[in-house]
Swiss-Prot record:
The gene is arcB. Belongs to the aspartate/ornithine carbamoyltransferase superfamily. OTCase family. Carbamoyl phosphate binds at S57, T58, R59, T60, Q84, R108, H135, P136, T137, Q138, C275, L276, R320. One of its GO terms (molecular function) is ornithine carbamoyltransferase activity. The keyword Membrane does not apply. This is Ornithine carbamoyltransferase, catabolic. GO terms for biological process: arginine biosynthetic process via ornithine; arginine catabolic process to ornithine; citrulline biosynthetic process; L-arginine biosynthetic process.
Amino acid sequence: MVISLKNRNFLKLLDYTPAEIQHLIDLAIELKAAKKAGCEKQTLIGKNIALIFEKTSTRTRCAFEVAAFDQGAQVTYLGPSGSQIGHKESMKDTARVLGRMYDGIEYRGFGQHIVEELGEYAGVPVWNGLTDEFHPTQILADLMTMLEHAPGKTLPELSFAYLGDARNNMGNSLMVGAAKMGMDIRLIAPKSFWPDAALVAQCREIASVTGARITLTESVEDGVHGVDFLYTDVWVSMGEPKEAWAERVSLMTPYQVNQQVVNATGNPDVKFMHCLPAFHNEHTKVGREIEMAYGLKGLEVTEEVFESAGSIVFDEAENRMHTIKAVMVATLGD
């Protein structure tokens, strides 16, 4: 079956079929191999790409820029203080302006409705670099990384547990990705931090077709047993006030990924994943504040696990670039 994603937006995985998602992962694997071998073919020569960042970023910005440059495209970075978007000009108007000047647009910001509006009116492919609800490019990288570290297996044969704040964009997106690809996902969190019930129902409906297994539980021991991968994210998301830390730390500490949790999987080959940045020690400004306030040297993951042989977080981070490149090539490439 020939799959063409030409001129498609990439706003959320719910918009894509399992075959289309697998196509993007396969393309990313091919592009990664070509780059390593020094034989990458450029398909974006002469293309101009706008990168809209209403939230700051390291990995997403670098991934989009390097991917674009590798493929021969030019980029314009519009940072949080470098444009009139939402202040003097609506997103609808911005979309129609940028769509006349650029061949593709990336957006990283707040509400999902904003990137959806951008995608509706731009007239060129729009890619979601992160919103409060979804982070689809991260999930492509995660699925690619899982396949790399489970040779000979397909995604429906893999299981993973996500611990922590499961109602954030990562919890949402991992659940959607697992549902679409027929995987076994366990979301382990306090019940008040489970994903929105409507999204859970939507994912369960998808799972009834794909064969995915979706488990929501408060029990760490039950949830992690037998999984291939452990996954976590920060406990306080971008944009949330510092005042939220105390309550969040109290609620989330039982869900920290530590050696005890690794042992509870019963899988000596279990791998650890994190979308980064991670609070795993006191070597950052925030890390020092956390240690002073709560006496903790790590939050969602301990230094021991983060730096262990089973940690594949930097493979995962690298794959952000390869999967983002795949999205741009598939939707915009010649």
